[in-house]
Amino acid sequence: MDYSLNSIEQCLQIMDKMKLMCNEDDDIEIFDEALYKVRTEADMSAIERLCNILDDKTEGPCSAMEDILNTIFYISEKYKQLEQGIYIFLSNSYKMIKYAVDWYEMFHRMVLWTPNLYEYYISAIKRLDKQNLEILLHTLHNIKKEDIEKDNGKNFFEEKVDFIIKSIK
C-alpha cells in the first residue's frame, strides 16, 4: 500500500491507523517515518493526537510507543513549552487510562527519572481538573507501591513521588 507522508495530519492518521500493528498493511518502517516527520515538523498541537495513538495492545515493537512518549517531550522542549506539553499529556489522562495505562504510567516514570522536569511537571499538575488529578495521583501511588527494590527493600520512587505530591498540595 502506498502511504502519503506529505503533511503532519497524514502522518498522524497513518500512525493512528497502524498503532496496533496487527493489520496486514501495517508497516513499522512507515510508522517510524511518519513519527519522524511529526517529531521534526509538528508543533504543540500534535501532542494530544500523539497521546491518542499510545496503546497498550500494540503488537509491534514497544519502542514505537516509547518513541511517541519521547516525541512528546521533544516537541515540548523544541518549542520551549515543557510545562504545556506535560499538561496536554496529563489533561488526556481520562482517555489514556482506558487504553494505554502502561504507557501512561511509563510517562510518569520517565518524568520521575528526570529531576530537571519536576518544576514543569508540578506546574502542569496544579492546572489539572479533578478527574485527571485523581487519575494522576492514583498512578503515582501505584508507582510508589510497585517499585520496591528487591535487594534492600527500598523503594526507588518513594521519595520522588512523595516530593511531587507534597509540592502540589
Can you name each region flagged by the protein language model?
Residues M18-F73:
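N-terminal interaction modules that seed assembly of large macromolecular complexes
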Residues M15, I86-L90, F107, I168:
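Generic hydrophobic, helix-prone segments enriched in Leu/Val/Ile
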Residues K17-C22, N52-G60, L90-Y99, R127-Q131:
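Solenoid-like repeat scaffolds
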Residues D26-V38, M65-I72, A100-I122, I135-K144, ...:
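Amphipathic alpha-helical elements of HEAT/ARM-like alpha-solenoid repeat scaffolds that form extended
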Residues D2-N6, K37-A46, E59, I72-Q84, ...:
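Alpha-helix capping and inter-helical loop/turn segments
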Residues C62-W103:
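Charged low-complexity stretches with an acidic bias
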Residues I8-L12, D43-L54, K78-S93, L117-S123, ...:
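Amphipathic alpha-helical scaffolding segments comprising HEAT/armadillo-like alpha-solenoid repeats
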Residues M1-Q13, D26, I122-K169:
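Eukaryotic acidic, Ser/Thr-rich intrinsically disordered low-complexity regions
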